[in-house]
Amino acid sequence: MDIEYVRSRFIKHFDGTTGAVYASPGRINLIGEHTDYNGGFVFPGAIDKGMIAEIKPNGTNTVKAYSIDLKDYVEFGLNEEDAPRASWARYIFGVCREMMKRGVDVKGFNTAFAGDVPLGAGMSSSAALESTYAYASNDLFGDNKIDKFELAKVGQSTEHNYCGVNCGIMDQFASVFGKKGSLIRLDCRSLEYQYFPFDPQGYRLVLVDSVVKHELASSAYNKRRQSCEAAVAAVQKKHPHVEFLRDVTMGMLEEAKADISAEDYMRAEYVIEEIQRVLDVCDALEKGDYETVGQKMYETHHGMSKLYEVSCEELDFLNDLAFDCGVTGSRVMGGGFGGCTINLVKDELYSTFIEKAKDEFKKKFGRSPKVYDVVISDGARRLE
């Protein structure tokens, strides 16, 4: 993303003046899927794709915002109760309101922003937008008195209160706390976190986007949560201390098998194994063992496909193709039923894999997948 591109549009739209420039990244999650609402671990990292915004206080109580990518302009008063109709402007409005709730004296400003986080590919473009404006508001109007953790919560509260999305905190957390060359293991129960080195020399991290989103996603997601809760309730009969599947071992699950439906058992088995895989991948990274990391990614895909049943034909096809091409690791990334696979690919296999993925996928499904190379990068920051 080019600062000068954003600056030129800002100057053109706002009478030749310039302001401060801020950026926040999108994110990937290397492993740890459907573990967040089970009290487990996730393992995200910020990426080199995100949002850049230029912002200048305008001495009024009105925010004047221009989306460069959408060529759309919105104005709103900071004391207005109703959020703007434009969905993208709701994120900025929500962040301003949430910062004000936390005691930051947000004033009116002019802003233009653009992004290179692909929409709908599971890299959290909305979290990048929220983090950009939360960080900027804190810097411009709050003397940076709001800590990073609270900035992530500002983004999450914006989703809940202004955008109707009941999300966890992983996306915003990764966007704010991202660090170049490191992934972040986040404990979704305690919210404690730890950085682990991720600098795979000789490998590339690449997302292959199936460009499909099956309609089942939201109802199926709710059913999976209910399955996990049912399994926990069954285990609690003998182990009342259990709060989440994170507290359950496979032995405990087996012990309660008679009280759990076959489907709920499969769902719980996947989650228990996935939480352990996150820990195994962290251990492997500390040893620089990327082969084990890749193996665990394949295990996750198998679990999401066969036990949690949130994959789809397109994603299974891409995963099988990656394995056949000798790709070190591959799995579906995100909630499932479409979206991307995330792949850990040796440099020397990269061109062959991408060419084959595009050709074979198009032959079978009649359209080409999109491909995104990503590098693990820094979180929200001021650029100029």
Residues covered by each model-derived region:
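C-terminal nucleotide
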Residues: 1-27, 52-85, 182-329, 344-384
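Short, amphipathic alpha-helical segments that act as regulatory/interfacial helices
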Residues: 47, 96, 134, 229-232
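Short, charge-rich binding segments
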Residues: 44-46, 54-57, 102-103
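Gly/Ser-rich oxyanion-binding loop with an adjacent helix/lid
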Residues: 1-22, 28, 32, 37, ...
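Short Gly/aromatic-enriched secondary-structure transition segments
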Residues: 39-46, 224-225
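FabD-like malonyl-/acyl-CoA
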Residues: 128, 340-344
